[in-house]
């Protein structure tokens, strides 16, 4: 039930992002926030509070320091705000739901790439198709990017494979 709910509200939130938004400096140097962050966050919070009033909400702009509770929704309204603000496609809306202390469903929507990821106890899906990790026959064939600048990492990956 919660999985279908977060899929629906994230799809609805995507529709809010079809116009230009103002960009502001936030907190530390280089940290940005846009009107889109606030718009999507308010929209998602209102939907969650109406449907799940007893669940806590943790969100990057609204309540970032709240402790994760047994029953809560965790929101990043625009993950990749710098990319979003600069017109780059690597950004997304993220929502996860915890119930009875377990993360039971999550969504990552990347509208600019037309990618919609959903995961729950039955697996992970991209645009409705089940996905899984690729088998790595030997450790030296394994490639991982951890932390850092996603754009720089993607550029290196394209250049060097």
Language model region names:
Residues 1-78:
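N-terminal subdomain of lithium-sensitive/metallo-dependent phosphomonoesterases centered on the IMPase/IPPase/PAP
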Residues 87-91:
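Catalytic core of PPM/PP2C metal-dependent serine/threonine phosphatase domains
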Residues 69-73, 93, 104:
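Short loop/turn microsegments at loop-to-beta-strand junctions
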Residues 96-161:
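Acidic beta-strand-loop-alpha-helix segment within the catalytic core
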